[in-house]
Amino acid sequence: LLYLFIVPPWQHYDEPGHFEHAWLIANRPTLPQPGDFDPAMRRTVAASMIEHDFYRGGAPPDLSQPDPLPIGLSQIDDYVAYYWLAALPLRFLQDADITHQLYATRMVSLLLFLLSIAGCWGAIRELTQPNNSLRWLLPMCLALLPAFADIMTAANNDSAAIAFSTWLIWGIVRLIQRGFSWVWLMGCAIGSVACLWSKTTTFPVVAGLALALPLSLLRGRGRWLVWAVAAATTLFIGATIIQWDDARGWFRASNQEAGVRRAVSQTPVGQYAFALESSAGSGMQIQQVIAPELTEALRGQTVTLGMWGWTDSQEPQSGYLPVLLIATTQGVPDTSSPYQKILLTTQPTYYSITTTLPENTARLWLALTAPVKPAKATTTSTLFLDEISLTKRVANGIDLPGNFVINSSAEFGVVRFRSSWQTPFAQLLRADPNHFVGALLDPHTRSIYISKFMNLSLQTFWARFAWGHVALRNPGLNLLLNFILVSGFLSSSCAVSSQLVANRGNLSIHTVHTLIVLGLISFGVCIAAIARANYILFLGSWFPSARYIYPAVMPVLLAVVGGWVMLFRQITPHHSQPFGEWVILALFASLNIYSLISIVQFYA
């Protein structure tokens, strides 16, 4: 309840947009459609945002400007389950102050917070023996997890997605532990629908039901048939939706049906070349992320961009030399090197251009572009590019040896989602899945991607608040919290593995299957969260990514807390076993109090 009131109005991520969706449902007879807004409501919200110092350090909007007045990212196209619930109290508060209406919406999220804790209690109760301390410890730790409490008391659709996912996990655990039940199957079906109408982050949890149902029906050795079928199905689907014809280290900024890496007989270097298609109304661009240390080395320097280029068309085709996209802050590119147009023929020809980078260059991307043809064009042409180069030029006009471009001749390939699958996966993840796959399979971008995501997700899992910009007063605590999380995971993994190998009697076969399903659900949720975070490669903005992991917060927190319970039982005398549980609870309570102090001091 403290988090609900202690964070100022509108100071949760996208809270104005989430509130707007619920408000439109409450005040209109039909569901809002993308693009809908109420001018008077937006002005009232903007005035409230100004009143509560939302724009401190920035420029507030001019309330007299023409409609639509911006109040943040619109959420009208989001799934509606949360907004239906949030609209219920607003129907009775239509004449109330807009800030009071926001707090009423936050109260709905608070109720969903309580439902999440109840779902966690139900799931751990099914999974453990009556005297197991995790039955009371895990729900209390969840209630005291600061960043989770902050998310679950904000006006946002994550609260519904997390609450419904936690209850569905309870149903999944019960089905596997106790066997098939029509009542619980119906409950899981209702929970699945609620999840699917809440947010796409819940989809891996819903997929877990596809494993739980056959496992609830097969109670003997036949259960392993379920895993065999699941593995075979996964391999078949994987082989169906992916292909190996893109260039490693290069990311699509637009889409074409064919791969961008193609074997060509006349390449100046190697056996492959980049193949970018150009047609009426459609061009193609691929980009490479320049590593931060290379960006720093090139800042303010004169560089040469070069390439070999040709086309498969008998008519000369327009193309561009490589372009450097430049960000002078940690955000998106705000300038670039010149777009130098060239004419390509069937004969491979070398082209180059020299440019000087700004002294304040913060981030760099190298782009290869096939331009859009005129509207009257009826054919599609392929532009072939090879041996892309980025070199530093010294004062006497000589280029230093050493190419800064990775995989400059497309000799190394990488898998990608087929174009027919890329679009639905991108809509599901709100991000291009090929960026995620390409980043993980490229050793040069993998370290950037994973290190930034891990730092981002670990902080936001424990204690990062509001729009992700409010941190603990002492940043050094993050190292301790990360140690606690990783150690808990390792401890629980070792404990479960040792029991499976040394003494199966301590874990029932039902519990083994349940833990596997929970592990797969957590893995799926985390992979989806990592995929959503591919903006790390192209943007510098802060996103509270742990909210994408919270639909699986129950099994994730179980691994952390359960691991530390087992550690304490190894290092404390047998007669003082509850000591470890009380230490863990005290840690969560202390972190919670310190988090509240940090929030109060930030907004003071």
Could you describe each region identified by the protein language model?
Residues 104-128, 167, 491-494:
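Transmembrane-helix motifs of polytopic, lipid-linked glycan transferases
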Residues 229-477:
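Extracellular and organelle-lumenal recognition/adhesion modules and their flexible linkers in secreted
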Residues 176-177, 205-237, 502, 507:
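Perimembrane helix-loop-helix junctions
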Residues 119-122, 160-178, 186, 190-192, ...:
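Specific aromatic-rich, kink-prone transmembrane helix
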Residues 462-516, 520, 560:
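Hydrophobic, aromatic-rich transmembrane alpha-helices
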Residues 184-199, 206:
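Membrane-interface alpha helices of multi-pass inner-membrane proteins
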Residues 96-99, 120-144:
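Transmembrane-helix signature of polytopic, membrane-embedded enzymes
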